[in-house]
Amino acid sequence: MSGGEKQRVLIARALTQEAKILILDEPISNLDLKFQLETMKILKNLAKENNLIVITILHDLNFAISYSDKILFLKNGKINNFGDTKKIITTSNIKEIFSVDIDIVQFKNKNYIIPLE
């Protein structure tokens, strides 16, 4: 099995437990783009349909923007910001936490983070 196949099996196993809270650490890190999108859509739909709390640890901020209702930023192991995705994902918050200048652009009604050099 490839790393991506193993990761999909682990996610499926977690979903069969029928827990009310699901915590996934980098659930899409070993998946190709198609399966990243599918997995995040499935998780979001399951959360809505089953009143499930899904906590995902993601380093890809564009996926976080697209699929999260709320965002929590950690800095030096402590909570730096928590709240609605649209309020937390700002150029100043990204600069403070990651020391990176970004632009947030909108395309087809979705926000995307573009790092600036």
What are the functions of these language-model segments?
Residues 18:
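Conserved catalytic motifs of ABC-family nucleotide-binding domains
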